[in-house]
Regions:
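A glycine-/small-polar-enriched, mobile loop at the entrance of the PLP active site in fold-type I
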Residues: 28-85, 89
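Active-site phosphate-binding strand-loop segment of PLP-dependent enzymes
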Residues: 139-195, 208, 216
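Conserved PLP-binding catalytic core of the aspartate aminotransferase-like
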Residues: 312-345
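PLP-dependent enzyme catalytic core of the Aspartate aminotransferase-like
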Residues: 22, 356, 360-387
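Active-site C-terminal subdomain of aminotransferase-like
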Residues: 38-39, 214-303
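Conserved active-site segment immediately N-terminal to the catalytic lysine
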Residues: 202-214
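Conserved beta-loop-alpha segment that forms the PLP phosphate-binding cup at the N-terminus of a helix
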Residues: 79-107, 111, 115-119
Length: 387
């Protein structure tokens, strides 16, 4: 007669043998949409390393290296530079909950979905939200921003660097000049831009910048690199009410991320941080200028090959993003059908348009590890077969 332990073990093995695991059906898909991007093989290997405790000395050393690597990538000396636990949207939420108080006048520059989302988050914090809107597919105009800033004082001005919904690169450097003169804090969404095009946080006068790991860093989604200037930290320290989100409170998180003695805040996503650490190592090994040149060259190759198929880019050349290409859908073409066939027949994923651009564009990503000539050619051959 089997013991209770043996019966239980037998039952567990029997269940394991008959229950299907849907992970067995996961296969390689060429991710050429607006994110996530293809993950570096070295990052997959890093994710599989044994999990350490979140206060283990070796893990603390890895955390410190991550901060240094992020500062190099963001071109900043900010002490408060760290990856938040959560996707890029957590980074956005963290930026606003730490810097915005009820009643603050906040100006959000909007030319796509993610600018609108910034305005919504600020509104939920009961800020006085003002928007300055531009046509989707066109950049924010610095002169228009400068004129608005002369009309009213704002506590904070927010803009998206790389508007993922449209493929537009906003001139955050020029915008920053006017924001600095106004005295407002300057908040920039770099979710898609970081690691794909140059970001100069300090030189551009940015007070708080956030990003995500799943775009040009070619790491799985789950972390939001963020950096905060001393000026922004001063506003945080001057708060007379608590930050309204405990999990994203930078004043608490910094006690875990810096200093000789670390204070527990929450259990860090250990293996995701391994992945980010390795992804940053991959970027630095290639060299920042080489990484930016690769994105630019693959964009130019894609545009040239799309042109041979009669396909056009929505955005004017001077403001195009190399890593996110908004491709106009030709008249009479079933854009959703093409996307479905690319995924089903060719294992290639591209994105659809959003908002007023829904049904009018495809969003083709060339982010991070995805930005390779072999991937561009594979997509072009698939489009040639399906159009």
């Amino acid at each position: 007669m089997r013991s209770a332990y043996t019966r239980r073990l037998f039952y567990d093995l029997r269940v394991e043998s008959v229950v299907s695991n849907k992970l067995d059906a996961v296969h390689d898909v060429l991710l050429m949409g607006p994110g996530p991007s293809c993950v570096y093989p070295d990052v997959y290997r890093a994710l599989a390393h044994p999990t350490l405790g979140h206060l283990d000395p070796l893990f603390i050393a890895i955390m410190d290296d991550i901060k240094t690597l992020l500062r190099t990538l963001m071109q900043t000396t900010n002490r408060a530079t760290l990856p938040m636990s959560g996707t890029g949207s957590a980074g956005m939420e963290a930026a606003f909950v730490n810097l915005v108080k009820p009643g603050d006048a906040v100006l959000v520059l909007v030319n796509g979905v993610f600018g609108k989302r910034m305005a919504e988050v600020a509104g939920r914090l009961r800020a006085q939200v003002y928007t300055l809107e531009f046509d989707w597919g066109t950049p924010v105009v610095p002169e228009t921003v400068a004129a608005r800033l002369q009309m009213k004082d704002y506590a904070l001005v927010a803009v998206v660097h790389a508007e993922t919904s449209t493929g537009v690169r906003n001139p955050v450097d020029k915008i920053g000049e006017s924001v600095k003169m106004s005295g407002a804090l300057y908040l920039v969404d770099a979710v898609t831009s970081l690691g794909g095009i140059p970001v100069h946080m300090d030189a551009w006068g940015i007070d708080l910048l956030y990003s995500g790991t799943q775009k040009c860093l070619s790491c799985p989604p789950g972390l939001a690199p963020l950096s905060c200037s001393e000026r922004a930290l001063a506003k945080l320290r001057a708060r007379t009410t608590p930050v309204p989100n405990w999990y994203l409170d930078l004043s608490l998180l910094l006690s875990y991320w810096e200093g000789a003695k670390r204070a527990y805040h929450h259990t860090a996503p250990i293996n995701m941080l391994y992945g980010l650490y390795q992804a940053l190592q991959c970027v630095m090994a290639e060299g920042l200028e080489n990484v930016y040149a690769r994105h630019r060259n693959m964009h130019e190759l894609l545009v040239a090959e799309l042109g041979k198929l009669g396909l056009e880019i929505l955005v004017e050349p001077d403001y195009r993003l190399p890593m996110l290409n908004a491709v106009k859908v030709p008249a009479g073409v079933d854009e959703a059908g093409v996307r479905a066939r690319l995924l089903g027949e060719h294992s290639i994923e591209i994105g659809a348009g959003l908002g007023p651009l829904a049904g009018k564009i495809w969003r083709v990503g060339l982010m991070g590890h995805t930005a390779r000539a072999v991937n561009v050619q594979r997509l072009i051959e698939a489009l040639r077969a399906e159009l």
